[in-house]
From Swiss-Prot:
Gene Ontology MF: a single term: argininosuccinate lyase activity
First-listed, main subcellular location of the protein, grouped into a coarse class: cytoplasm
Source superkingdom: Bacteria
Pathway: Amino-acid biosynthesis; L-arginine biosynthesis; L-arginine from L-ornithine and carbamoyl phosphate: step 3/3
PANTHER family noted in UniProt: ARGININOSUCCINATE LYASE
Annotated localization: Cytoplasm
Lineage: Bacteria, Bacillati, Bacillota, Bacilli, Bacillales
Family listed: Belongs to the lyase 1 family. Argininosuccinate lyase subfamily.
Coiled coil: none
Enzyme class: lyase
E.C. code: 4.3.2.1
Protein name: Argininosuccinate lyase
């Protein structure tokens, strides 16, 4: 077939060259955005008298037909037409005649594709924000059910201090809240229109960029046409924000995997989110959590891939920029899928409160309580720290825990120890006393839950 840009050329490309250069296999995902962008563009052209109202109406009727066909998956795309833009233009001309060729007046594929991607990411980021909020709502529900569920808190994957399970869960709530904030902030840069920037230098036609931007729901326009067609910061920012979100999901999944093991038994995954072994009938594998952890690397790769593509590109458009889309599409699909799985997995998991409780009575995570006890009685904390270290050594040598040590032995270590020490050693009491702002104390958790509910109330309503 003859190319819409073929006037300059005397030879046709080989089929394999066409296939190598074509992007329609993946950029057809932008079909709705491409048609909607064209609707706004031709409306603006008519307003400015660049095309007649009659021509604009004919073009819009043709575009509306193609949009309907697209939504019903009836459009047949061709590699020969290269990309989504030329495919749609070719179909439009076939549908309404040569007047369809006037649609591209005052526009280039360079500003057209950038517009499509801005529209696409605006929609997808808003969807990801909503999905993240739904996950946060599940975290709030699990936290509410586990305010007084005591578990070991860890540093270096060693038991450190007793904490509330709700406190641990809410740590991820606030990580996700930062992710939401980053996505929301990025919308300020996504919601800007490059349409009308032309190939790189603007256009000689008297277009109204602000009007077409308004029609598409953008908050403004790019101030520089070179920047408009060559900028992919908005995609990189999306990939970066998504990498951080996936990192948070991956960290949580790592803990869920550990907690569901026989060595911990803190939680049990629902059968819906686990699989078995083809050879070992006893196995219940946390495959969905492992997949989320694994897919995090995939999202990181998409970010670094585009950063590498962009690092040496001169202004303005270069064909290298065709490589901006597949990683973006893949990241959207991956993040949406992981959020959906994570939400269901956390909503259906069973918390083994008894196992968690046993874990904090069979360790030394209450050692800091003794150091604080002595410090409250006037002993310098460093001296208290040394005494408790010796107590832990004594216990490990005897094969006992701090609650098992007699008061007589405690007094041999320091005359400051009294009977009330054993109240301090209770994991429940240890958690309750940590009432500093943001701490694991029950009152602090209740305060945190109120704030968290306020941030997710719109999701709960819907």
């Amino acid at each position: 077939m003859s190319k819409l840009w073929g006037g300059r050329f005397t030879e046709e490309a080989e089929a394999w060259v066409e296939e190598f250069g074509a992007s329609i296999s993946f950029d057809q995902q932008l079909v709705n955005q491409d048609i909607n962008g064209s609707m706004a563009h031709v409306t603006m052209l008519a307003k400015q008298g660049i095309v007649t109202q009659e021509e604009a109406e004919k073009i819009k009727i043709g575009l509306q037909y193609l949009l309907k066909e697209a939504k019903e998956n009836k459009l047949q795309f061709s590699v020969e037409a290269e990309d989504i833009h030329l495919n749609i233009e070719k179909m439009l001309i076939e549908q309404i005649g040569e007047v369809g060729g006037k649609l591209h007046t005052g526009r280039s594929r360079n500003d057209q594709v950038a517009t499509d991607m801005h529209l696409y990411l605006k929609e997808k980021v808003e969807h990801i924000i909503k999905a993240t909020k739904q996950l946060q709502t599940v975290l709030v529900q699990q936290a509410e059910n586990n305010i007084e569920t005591i578990m070991p808190g860890y540093t270096h994957l060693q038991r450190a201090q007793p904490i509330s399970f709700a406190h641990h869960i809410l740590a991820y709530f606030w990580m996700l809240e930062r992710d939401v904030n980053r996505y929301e902030d990025s919308l300020k840069r996504i919601n800007i229109s490059p349409l009308g920037a032309g190939a790189l230098a603007g256009t000689t036609f008297p277009i109204d960029r602000e009007y077409s931007a308004e029609l598409l729901g953008f908050n403004g326009i790019y101030e520089n046409s070179l920047d408009a067609v060559s900028d992919r910061d908005f995609i990189l920012e999306f990939l970066s924000n998504s990498s951080m979100l996936m990192m948070h999901l991956s960290r949580f999944c790592e803990e869920l995997i550990l907690w569901s093991s026989q060595e911990f038994q803190f939680i049990e995954m629902s059968d819906q989110y686990a699989t078995g072994s083809s050879i070992m009938p006893q196995k219940k594998n946390p495959d969905m959590a492992e997949l989320i952890r694994g897919k995090t690397g995939r999202v990181y790769g998409n970010l670094f891939s585009l950063l590498t593509v962009m690092k040496g590109l001169p202004l303005a458009y270069n064909k290298d920029l065709q490589e901006d889309k597949e990683g973006m599409f893949d990241t959207v699909k991956t993040v949406e899928g992981c959020l959906h799985i994570m939400t269901g997995m956390l909503e259906t998991m069973t918390v083994n409160k008894e196992k968690m409780g046993q874990a904090v009575t069979q360790d030394f995570s209450n050692a800091t309580e003794i150091a604080d006890y002595l410090a409250n009685k006037g002993l310098p904390f460093r001296q208290a720290h040394e005494i408790v270290g010796k107590l832990v050594l004594y216990c490990t040598q005897k094969g006992i825990y701090l609650l098992d040590v007699s008061l007589e032995t405690y007094k041999e270590m320091s005359s400051l120890f009294e009977e009330d020490l054993y109240e301090v050693l209770s994991p429940y009491a240890a958690v309750k006393r940590r009432n500093s702002a943001g701490g694991t104390g029950f009152e602090q958790i209740k305060n945190a839950l109120e704030k968290a509910k306020g941030l997710t109330k719109e999701v709960i309503k819907n």
